[in-house]
């Protein structure tokens, strides 16, 4: 071809299939997509050079079309052959195992025009090892009548003698060894290993007749060839990429002792490739190893040999689809040492292919007859012209004409070849990989079973309780409750309870106290509780808490008892911390220790007073004689009564003018405190903290009340437990906690945990700053060694080791974090979404709180959050802590536009310089109510201004003038007030507002512009583009004035 050519046209011209051409082009470095692709002329020349013989030598179709100038087939290359040795002597057919001859399939009739061998085959030597394959000239095969299947089966019963003279054979010629005179029914000789280089005799498969002589199976009436000798067959090399992995070893008929049944006539030949391709040896004999076989035509690795370079075609089944330029005429008979093979079945629709001329058909693999092939093909058609081949094996293979085993090398034996996955199989695998996991797992139902869950529990926690899959619960929450929740996300109490109702469980949310108790029980620990019977109890001093209204003299009274001056050190003259002291009072000549706890009286320290009432034994309620009962007095009284502790009332400031102690007694009677002199059981003591009068009576009343109503005993030999009264961050000492030991003895070196803080006791200090080595019950001390500042009111206890303390603290932190996440998350509804949208629009003040002690920070936070100046402004505390203001606080405030509030603390290091550089405002306070007042004023200043309308004046329209390029101008008379230019106006007609939000754009007095016109004067008023002005209309002007927020 001179120009471009398509691949399939080149394949037809070269006498090969398109796949071979595509493979050769790939080897030549030319990429071609498919058989319909075109290639350039230089590529065509390169391809023809690679196939010189195929492109020039003529060929004839199998089936009998004579070819002109057929070249003789070259002899096979001599080489070592590994196979079963043939008989040592004798020319008769070899019997199969057991002495029975194997019925063979009749050979095909020679086609018209078939050539005869030009020269007779030479007789071999007596030893097969010395036999050399003779040369033969290809001739056209002669047509002959193919025997019917019944006749073939009958003729297969008797053995046929070996041919002694050349005879016409319906096949392409191939040299065949001629043995000596046959001996019928002679048992086979002992196996003998052939000498390398000799011919490879080997039996054909059952049902395959032997060819090559007159009267043989290739001709009419040919007898069957004996079956193969028993024994395994080694794997032969194969390079067929399309070999089915299901094709296993040959059936037992080719290797075992019993021959298989003959295949059905017309059935497709098993395991054979498409007709017309390179043929491997037929089954039945032991195949040689790769190194002992002659080079295979069409194999991988090198250019395809020309027909002149190829050895005689083996008798195996066909390969690629035949065409008119593909085959050369061959003499009858198989290659030396190789049996003849049957032809492959035809293409679908073209009928079953007949056996190749000169060879018998294959027996089915797997030992069972396969599926029948197509009908006999017409002479001259590729693959046709004879009865159908052998049956197809049940073990699979390729469709449309059988397997391709042998097309590119024998397959199905030894190592299984790789099989291509079909598009359907790949699609199914892909779809199965994309299949979503099924979530329809069954969730166990509960019949009112109770489940205890902590605050902020997740669906995974719920699933652990009911032994279910968390993913199933996620699906239930989504489908039943309509809420998207992950398996590890903290859920609100409402969500957990609704899920329990849906599944039939009663969900009980564990309180923080019970949750902490369960946590300690998991470590074999407990806090509080009754004492064991075998625990030795010792007397302890009473714990007394002083409570009352602000400025009623609580701290001054404690100073009088302790003979100190604490009030002088308090900022603003008010107590802002919980102070714990232990004093010794002499009662009835005996020195008795008493522990006093001072609580703030300001309204913002409610939590401190509540904690003071919980840890105390007796409450001393201080009431000023000149001021009487106040709100914080009632609040402190309620705390004491809620704690169920006895109360002693100290009426202070009795030395002041206007003091009325009797009035105080009368007021407290209304709240259930009846004085002893009034017939009650409450002790009232009149004291003066300034003059230090009545102090001894007060301490005596405390001791008498404690002895009369309390059992003041506690164990001292157990691990210490108590409560953290206060916590602060000391610059030189780190976190410092003021604790009150309630039971046991606290010693230096103990591992302690208090709330979310833990550590080891490094030092202990008393109220005077002196170090102590141990602290017994009812003893307040300052403890150093915590990793963080404990919160005021946290319980502390001693644990066996630091590891346990750390684990308890971490679990408490996780518990609080989950609870906060659950509260902050909530259940999203339309109302909450709208509220969040409104919150995004309103102004917000961000604060960072730093204080000296945890109790003060807590009180300040609670007080600030109670400030309410309206819904337009919000207050958010983004961080709080104990200790000095650090650079980290400044950076956080800079990132969030927050203001830092320092309560009794100062900046640390370069925090001041960083705050100035970042523009962060830092405010310092020492009195809590000053901080509250400033923050409240700041919030009010952030409120949006409120405007109200103020009327300026009215004017009556007397005449309407039309001015070009200006519009209508109202000639008016000012009736009241002032009419100003550029002010807002509205037009009123018959008492109805016609137009509102107008602007007085022009104001003239005659022809002069005027800024304002007063009452009683005439003027011209222009309202811009508004021209609907009529006589007797009233123009009213007004302005918006800002109203201060209160």
From Swiss-Prot:
Composition-biased stretches (Gly residues): 210-222, 334-414
Annotated region (G5), positions in chain: 688-690
Chain segments carrying region G2: 573-577
G3 as annotated region, ranges: 598-601
Entry's transmembrane regions: none
Assigned GO CC terms: cytosol
Composition bias, Pro residues: 94-111, 160-176, 188-206, 223-235, 260-281, 304-314
PROSITE patterns documented for this protein: G_TR_2 (PS51722), IF2 (PS01176)
SUPFAM superfamilies documented for this protein: Initiation factor IF2/eIF5b, domain 3, P-loop containing nucleoside triphosphate hydrolases, Translation proteins
Region annotation (Disordered) ranges: 49-448
Gene Ontology MF terms in the entry: GTP binding; GTPase activity; translation initiation factor activity
Primary location group: cytoplasm
Subcellular location: Cytoplasm
Name by which UniProt lists this protein: Translation initiation factor IF-2
Gene: infB
């Amino acid at each position: 071809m001179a120009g471009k050519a398509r691949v399939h046209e080149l394949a037809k011209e070269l006498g090969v299939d398109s796949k071979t051409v595509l493979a050769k082009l790939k080897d030549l470095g030319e990429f071609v997509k498919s058989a319909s692709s075109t290639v350039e002329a230089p590529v065509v020349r390169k391809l023809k050079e690679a196939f010189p013989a195929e492109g020039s030598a003529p060929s004839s179709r199998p089936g009998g079309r004579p070819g002109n100038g057929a070249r003789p087939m070259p002899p096979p290359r001599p080489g070592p052959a590994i196979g079963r040795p043939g008989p040592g002597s004798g020319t008769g057919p070899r019997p199969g195992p057991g002495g029975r001859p194997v019925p063979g399939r009749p050979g095909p009739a020679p086609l018209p025009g078939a050539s005869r061998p030009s020269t007779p085959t030479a007789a071999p030597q007596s030893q097969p090892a010395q036999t050399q394959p003779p040369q033969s000239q290809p001739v056209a095969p002669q047509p002959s009548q193919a025997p019917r299947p019944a006749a073939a089966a009958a003729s297969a019963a008797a053995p046929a003698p070996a041919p002694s003279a050349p005879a016409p054979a319906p096949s392409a010629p191939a040299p065949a060894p001629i043995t000596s005179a046959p001996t019928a029914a002679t048992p086979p000789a002992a196996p003998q290993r052939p000498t390398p280089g000799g011919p490879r005799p080997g039996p054909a498969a059952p049902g395959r007749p032997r060819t090559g002589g007159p009267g043989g199976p290739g001709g009419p009436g040919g007898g069957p060839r004996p079956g193969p000798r028993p024994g395994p067959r080694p794997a032969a090399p194969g390079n067929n990429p399309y070999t089915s992995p299901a094709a296993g070893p040959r059936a037992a008929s080719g290797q075992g002792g019993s021959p298989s049944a003959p295949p059905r006539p017309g059935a497709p030949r098993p395991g054979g490739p498409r007709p017309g391709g390179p043929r491997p040896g037929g089954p039945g004999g032991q195949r040689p190893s790769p190194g002992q076989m002659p080079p295979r035509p069409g194999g991988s690795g090198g250019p395809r040999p020309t027909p002149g370079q190829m050895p005689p075609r083996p008798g195996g089944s066909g390969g690629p689809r035949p065409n008119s330029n593909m085959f050369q005429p061959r003499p009858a008979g198989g290659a030396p040492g190789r049996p003849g093979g049957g032809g492959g079945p035809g293409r679908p629709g073209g009928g079953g292919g007949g056996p190749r001329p000169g060879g018998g058909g294959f027996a089915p693999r797997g030992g069972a007859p396969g599926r029948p092939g197509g009908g006999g093909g017409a002479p001259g058609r590729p693959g046709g012209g004879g009865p159908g081949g052998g049956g197809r094996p049940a073990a699979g293979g390729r469709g449309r004409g059988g397997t391709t085993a042998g097309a590119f090398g024998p397959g199905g034996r030894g190592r299984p070849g790789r099989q291509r996955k079909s598009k359907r199989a790949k699609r199914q695998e892909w779809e199965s990989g994309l299949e979503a996991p099924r979530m329809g797992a069954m969730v166990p139902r509960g019949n009112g079973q109770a489940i205890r869950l902590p605050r902020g529990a997740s669906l995974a926690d719920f699933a652990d309780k009911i032994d279910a899959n968390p993913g199933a619960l996620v699906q239930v929450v989504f489908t039943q409750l309509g809420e998207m929740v992950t398996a590890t996300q903290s859920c609100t109490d409402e969500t957990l309870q609704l899920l329990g109702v849906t599944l039939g469980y009663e969900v009980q949310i564990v309180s923080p106290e019970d949750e902490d108790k369960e946590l300690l029980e998991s470590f074999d620990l407990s806090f509080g509780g009754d004492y064991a019977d075998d625990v030795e109890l010792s007397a302890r001093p009473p714990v007394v808490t002083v409570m009352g209204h602000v400025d009623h003299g609580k701290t001054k009274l404690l100073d009088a008892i302790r003979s100190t001056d604490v009030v002088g050190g308090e900022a603003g003259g008010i107590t802002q911390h919980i102070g714990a002291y232990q004093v010794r009072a002499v009662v009835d000549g005996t020195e008795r220790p008493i522990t006093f706890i001072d609580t703030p009286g300001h309204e913002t320290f409610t939590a401190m007073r509540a904690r003071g009432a919980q840890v105390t034994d007796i409450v001393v309620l201080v009431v000023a004689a000149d001021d009487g009962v106040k709100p914080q007095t009632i609040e402190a009284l309620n705390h004491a009564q809620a704690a169920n502790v006895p109360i002693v009332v100290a009426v202070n400031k009795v030395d002041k003018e206007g003091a009325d102690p009797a009035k105080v007694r009368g007021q407290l009677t209304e709240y259930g405190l009846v004085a002893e002199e009034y017939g009650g059981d409450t002790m009232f003591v009149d004291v003066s903290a300034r003059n230090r009068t009545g102090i001894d009576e007060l301490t005596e009343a405390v001791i008498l009340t404690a002895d009369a109503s309390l059992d003041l005993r506690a164990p001292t030999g157990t691990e210490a437990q108590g409560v953290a009264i206060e916590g602060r961050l000391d610059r030189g000492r780190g976190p410092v906690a003021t604790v009150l030991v309630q039971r046991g003895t606290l010693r230096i070196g103990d591992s302690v945990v208090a709330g979310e803080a833990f550590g080891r006791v490094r030092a202990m200090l008393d109220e005077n700053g002196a170090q102590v080595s141990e602290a017994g019950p009812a003893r307040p001390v300052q403890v150093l060694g915590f990793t963080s500042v404990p919160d005021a009111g946290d319980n502390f206890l001693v644990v066996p080791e630091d590891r346990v303390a750390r684990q308890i603290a971490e679990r408490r932190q996780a518990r609080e974090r989950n609870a906060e996440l659950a509260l902050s998350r909530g259940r999203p509804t339309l109302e909450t979404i709208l509220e969040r949208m409104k919150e995004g629009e309103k102004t917000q003040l961000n604060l960072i709180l730093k204080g000296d002690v945890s109790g003060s920070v807590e009180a300040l936070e609670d007080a600030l959050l109670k400030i309410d100046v309206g819904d337009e402004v919000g207050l958010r505390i983004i961080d709080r802590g104990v200790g000095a203001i650090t650079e980290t606080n400044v950076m956080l405030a800079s990132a969030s536009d927050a203001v830092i509030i320092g309560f009794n603390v100062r900046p640390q290091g370069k925090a001041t310089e960083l705050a100035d550089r970042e523009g962060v405002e830092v405010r310092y306070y020492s009195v809590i109510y000053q901080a509250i007042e400033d923050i409240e004023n700041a919030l009010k200043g952030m409120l949006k201004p409120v405007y109200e309308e103020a009327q300026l004046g009215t004017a009556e329209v007397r005449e309407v003038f039309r001015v070009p390029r200006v519009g209508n101008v109202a000639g008016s008379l000012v009736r009241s007030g002032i009419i100003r230019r550029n002010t807002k106006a509205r037009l009123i007609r018959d008492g109805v507002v016609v137009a509102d939000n107008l602007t007085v754009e022009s104001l003239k007095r005659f022809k002069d512009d005027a800024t304002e016109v007063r009452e009683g004067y005439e003027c011209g008023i222009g309202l811009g583009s508004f021209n609907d002005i009529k006589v007797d209309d009233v123009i009213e002007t007004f302005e918006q004035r800002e109203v201060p927020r209160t």
